[in-house]
Amino acid sequence: MTPEFDEEVVFENSPLYQYLQDLGHTDFEICSSLSPKTETCLTTEEPQTPPTRVLQKQGILLKLTETIKSWTLSSQYSKKDDLLHKLDTGFRLDALDAILQQEVLLQEDVELIELLDPSILSAGHPQQENGHLPTLCSLATPNIWDVSMLFAFISLLIMLPTWWIVSSWLVWGIILFLYLIIRVLKFWRTAKLQMTLKKYRVRLEDMAANSRAFTNLVRKSLRLIQETEVISRGFTLLLDRVSAACSFNKAAQHPSQHLIGLRKAVYRTVRANFQAARLATLYMLKNYPLNSESDNVTNYICVVPFKELGLGLSEDQISEEEARNLTDGFSLPALKVLFQLWVAQSSEFFRRLALLLSTANSPSGPLLTAALLPHRILSDVTQGLPHAHTACLDELKRSYEFFRYFETQHQSVPQRLPKTQPKWRELNNVHTAVRSLQLHLKALLNEVIILEDELEKLVCTKETQELLSEAYPVLEQRLKLIEPHVQASNSCWEEAISQVDRLLRRNTDQKGKPGVACENPHCTAAPLLRPTLHIEDRDPIPEEQELEAYVDGIDIESEFRKDSLYHVSQEDRERQKREQEESKRVLQELKSVLGFKASEAERQKWKQLLFSDHAVLKSLSPVEPVESVSNSETPMNSDTEQAHSEATEEETSKPCASDKEDTRTEYMCDGPPKGQSKDTSGDQGHLLQGAHQCESEAKPPQAAAAGATAPPTPRDSPRLSIKQRLARLQLSPEYTFTAGLAAEVAARSLSFTTMQEQTFGDEEDEDKEQLVEGGERELEEK
């Protein structure tokens, strides 16, 4: 047939030829199916065909030479190929077993592996005899070739006795030594390769274990963050975590601000591990491709662009502010999405690695070389992935342990709180416990309402016994749902009781000095006492100082804020307000009556009497102070004295606003400590802010002077005599009320260095004197 197609040419025995014959057309050119050149070649080659016997002889010789050649080659490379095959198969099976044992694959990835290569899932089956790397003993075992060579050498020595000549021993010894050296070098090379494969297998196990540990640690961190967010709203997830609830001064804090350091650590570590696993998977797909089913892009997350994933998962480094904006302030939903991406990407990497290390992809026969062993593939694929796993795991573990074992317990245990803790942390703890109790009771009430509705339906409707028997398990399940809330409510109640008891037993002295606790179960804990103020001797007016200390008391509503703890009714508030206003009005009237200015000469006398060391230490006769004070008194008319006496009677008859309580507390005055000198500076006094107002208002000057506690030590005998003399001054008719008040302040200022808290009730004066004497004996014993 010519290169140019001729439409008139029809091949013989072709379908077109048969069709034309059937139609009756015979006027066309017929061409044979073979070309003329082929026909001529066939005619010329037919007489040159050799006989069959010659062909048979040539085939036998070729087969014999190929057999000898293959036997010689197999004798040289059979052992090496067998060892490489054992090492390759053993490493692949051990690597697959490590991946499957660590459970780093998701269920969908396991199903996909079972669909693509079912032999991978049976890699760790105990029936696999070659599932482990060959040991060094198996590698050192001689094969048939070595044994045959040894027997051949011995047989030659026995058959040829002439070789037993001593001169020939050197030659045969050198040959045997060289053979042994070659065998030892081969064994050393094989053992080194076996140790390398074993090291990479351990590295793969560690990488899978670190990946699993990191996943579990991220899950624990997210759970801790979620629990902290829920606890910050006042609801406790665990019964033993009631005391670990945050104080309500953080209740207004945004949920994303809790454990912000742990949130940042979770984001950084998960992002770094996700990027490393993604790059390793892409590298496998590019440099070690498999079949189209295994490398289908629909089965891989790593081919999805970063822009579609979001959350700052780009290859470029981003700042902390950008990460905060992209994750909505490291919110819990964003961290959960990032965690799900990491779990899927990690499982995808190990799935692709398992397919790559499958025994089905192992090179067969002489194609297997030391350069193609799977440990080189593993080293090339992983590269920096194990280091990234280890670094991220260590960083997240440090952050998690800090926030779990240090910050949480640091906030939950009151003894570990620093000195700069919130002022009302005890009240915050009580509020948290009560808030938790309220939420648990609400949940309990909802469950009880649901249970009651179901019981009413069962009672009202006439059901058969079978339906009732089916409803019993439902009721049992409802009761089991109620039980945790009951236990949690009991725990919250016990926590609130313990916090209130701690408030009642709290030591008011921060320096560790024992204080007298209030025995009244209804009284609240008093605020901490302020340090004693030192008053300079610039213009000492005793009555004004006493009244100012009385008026400028602590504002209970602003300082203590007891309304946050006890809910007082509106009537009680109005009554307390009226009583406070009445007491202030009486005090202002009393101060306006008594607050006149004394003359300079009288002030000088008071200074000498109150603040002079000579006046304190000098022993005077009982008549001298009366004369000195009576001489210094200015003449006053009878109207003024009558006003003073009326004010005194009004003050003594005025009931205290807080006399409804059973007990009252008074700070008694003691002498200075032993380490303090007697001659205290005369230009300094002491003022206690926040003293109990009702005691000062209800006592007349005579009772106040009589109720002062005498110092117990014999060193204070001069001061005792001074107090007695000052008490005698009040009995003098020439000694006015103002002078008596000044004498009372003088008596108190001499022993105003230490304070003692003592409780009084409605006892008689004899009981009071017994208490004073008992306090003196206790101080003498101390």
UniProtKB/Swiss-Prot annotation:
GO terms for molecular function: myosin binding. The chain crosses the membrane at residues 139-159, 162-182. Pfam families: Vezatin. InterPro entries: Myosin-bd (IPR026859), Vezatin (IPR026858). Its main location: membrane. It is a multi-pass membrane protein. Residues 565-584, 618-720, 756-782 are annotated as: Disordered. Interacts with USH2A (via the cytoplasmic region); the interaction associates VEZT with the USH2 complex at the stereocilia base. Interacts with myosin MYO7A and the cadherin-catenins complex. Plays a pivotal role in the establishment of adherens junctions and their maintenance in adult life. Required for morphogenesis of the preimplantation embryo, and for the implantation process. This is Vezatin. It comes from Rattus norvegicus. The lineage of its organism: Eukaryota, Metazoa, Chordata, Craniata, Vertebrata. The gene is Vezt.
